[in-house]
Design a protein with these regions (language model features):
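N-terminal targeting signals for export/organelle localization
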Residues: 1-36, 143
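A short beta-strand-turn-helix
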Residues: 26-54
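Short pre-active-site segment immediately N-terminal to redox-active cysteine/selenocysteine motifs
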Residues: 51-54, 58-62, 128
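Conserved redox-active cysteine motifs that mediate thiol-disulfide chemistry
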Residues: 58-78
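Thiol-based oxidoreductase modules, predominantly thioredoxin-like and allied folds used
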Residues: 82-97, 107-117
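Solvent-exposed loop/turn segments at secondary-structure junctions
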Residues: 60-64, 91-96, 117-119, 140, ...
């Protein structure tokens, strides 16, 4: 089940509302420069495999290891802007906790929110987080299970 929340900002704490009719399927959360979290609706396949490389970072607010990996992901976002799209995927987390962490950690890349250990179509074989997957312009997986500096090495190799 793909799930996210309608979000508004109150100070620095993002707040979720009740789901709109039809639920939160295909919702994408983005932290703006103002510190507010915005909601749009899009399909996973509209974000991945559209002629650009995509780095998907599966994480949860409670994962210390995911927080340790975040600087590597943010460095890719900054260094390869326009060449590599970075998507966060909160996984197995409470929605409010995910939104709070996005604000706290300054995660400005868009996020899909998966709850109840659901994943899109079961296609990624997620057995632990954090998990980083690099997709090619065709949407096929190029590399996965990268950590730390391995992430940038995989991106550099793919862009050659």
């Amino acid at each position: 089940m793909l799930f996210a929340a309608v979000v508004f900002s109150s100070g620095f704490r993002a707040q979720a509302q009740d789901p709109p009719p039809g639920g939160f399927k295909n919702a994408l959360l983005t932290l703006g420069k103002s510190g507010k979290v915005a909601l749009t609706y899009t399909l996973w396949d509209q974000q991945v495999g559209k002629g650009t490389y995509t780095l998907a970072f599966f994480w949860a607010s409670w994962s210390d290891e995911a927080r340790e990996e975040l600087p590597y992901i943010q460095a890719i976002q900054k260094k390869y802007a326009g060449k590599v799209k970075v998507l966060g995927v909160t996984y197995g987390d409470e929605i409010q906790d995910s939104m709070d962490a996005m604000v706290e950690l300054g995660m400005t890349f868009p996020h899909f929110v998966f709850v109840e250990d659901a994943e899109p179509d079961g296609r990624f074989d997620i057995d632990s987080i954090p998990l980083t997957i690099l997709f090619g312009p065709d949407g096929k997986i190029i590399a996965r299970d990268m950590k730390g500096e391995e992430i940038e090495k995989a991106v550099e190799e793919a862009l050659r």
